[in-house]
């Protein structure tokens, strides 16, 4: 199932707004300044703060702690809050330059507190530049803008509401089908399957339905599993067809 970049981005932002803890965030690859400006329009429409996390931040900048400079100036220990305590979403302006200590603390916080969505930018221009894998694993969505002209990138952004969205019902058979699909794609971790199941349930709700249908599963897999795929299922089937059959 293929969907265009604009719709994919719109759906990703809708799902992140509904349940940040289930989906973590989104990665934009190859975004130009013009692309970034379009993305920032979401925050202008929604009146949501975007807190920037820079690669030179310390762990204390993230989580808070003693401010050494102000403590020296005032003569007593001064504590300050970290950026993660602020309301709003978060932006990692350059994932590739983020030191491992900062990556580890950010992923730890994502696993242990209800963190707002993270918008990450993968600006790696060389083949040897790799975005932090542990952080990428926790961000459900990935949008590749490398081949998308800035004047063709116009997602339908929307204001965020505080109303709670319920999840549509999903059957055990549908859950099993998601897990099987993930395995066929060569994905052996449970997190992407969990994200896909949640996405299917919320996509059904957004379509005013109380139960998940196959089209929800297909769309959720396209949004979350496709860019993680290590194996293309069609290739597996072709390989199996080429194998000589055993004689009885």
How would you name each of these model-derived features?
Residues 1-4, 155-160, 239-248:
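N-terminal charge/polar-biased segments
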Residues 1-149:
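Conserved ASCE/P-loop NTPase catalytic core
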Residues 2-6, 29-33, 52, 167-172, ...:
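Conserved phosphate/pyrophosphate-binding and hydrolysis machinery centered on Walker-type P-loop NTPases
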Residues 140-180, 184-193, 209-210:
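Conserved C-terminal "switch" segment of AAA+ ATPases
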Residues 177, 194-199, 216-219:
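Amphipathic alpha-helical interaction segments
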Residues 183-190, 197-212, 223-231:
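AAA+ ATPase "lid" subdomain C-terminal helix
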Residues 209-248:
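C-terminal engagement/docking regions of AAA+ P-loop ATPases
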